[in-house]
UniProtKB/Swiss-Prot annotation:
Function: Insecticidal neurotoxin that reversibly inhibits the N-methyl-D-aspartate (NMDA)-subtype of ionotropic glutamate receptor (GRIN) and inhibits inactivation of insect sodium channels (Nav). In vivo, is highly toxic to insects.
Family of this protein: Belongs to the neurotoxin 03 (Tx2) family. 05 subfamily.
Species of provenance: Phoneutria nigriventer
Domain notes: The presence of a 'disulfide through disulfide knot' structurally defines this protein as a knottin.
GO cellular component, one term: host cell postsynaptic membrane
Disulfide cross-links: C35-C49, C42-C55, C46-C81, C48-C65, C57-C63
Expression sites by tissue: Expressed by the venom gland.
Protein name: U1-ctenitoxin-Pn1a
Alphabetically ordered keywords of this record: Disulfide bond, Ion channel impairing toxin, Ionotropic glutamate receptor inhibitor, Knottin, Neurotoxin, Postsynaptic neurotoxin, Secreted, Signal, Toxin, Voltage-gated sodium channel impairing toxin
């Protein structure tokens, strides 16, 4: 019985990892290049990837994408960005 449970668990894990890999192939690099990751230069919050990442210009002369201290508020602001996540 234990062997069957372990076998089924491995089978489910194999199918899950295959579907995740297929989802990654659906989004080309050009689509993910529309927004910047953490520490990427930015001009507005919409230039940064992720719902909790904001464009921070307070601590230096150049603006960079940083993790927001208020992720819920940032997610609401990001909802109004056009074609960027």
């Amino acid at each position: 019985m234990k062997v069957a449970i372990v076998f089924l668990s491995l089978l489910v894990l194999a199918f899950a990892s295959e579907s995740i890999e297929e989802n990654r192939e659906e989004f080309p690099v050009e689509e993910s290049a529309r927004c910047g990751d953490i520490n990427a230069p930015c001009q507005s919050d919409c230039d940064c990837c992720g719902y909790s990442v904001t464009c921070d210009c307070y601590w230096s002369s150049s603006c960079k994408c940083r993790e927001s201290l208020f992720p819920l508020g940032m997610a609401l602001r990001k909802a109004f960005c056009q074609n960027k996540i």
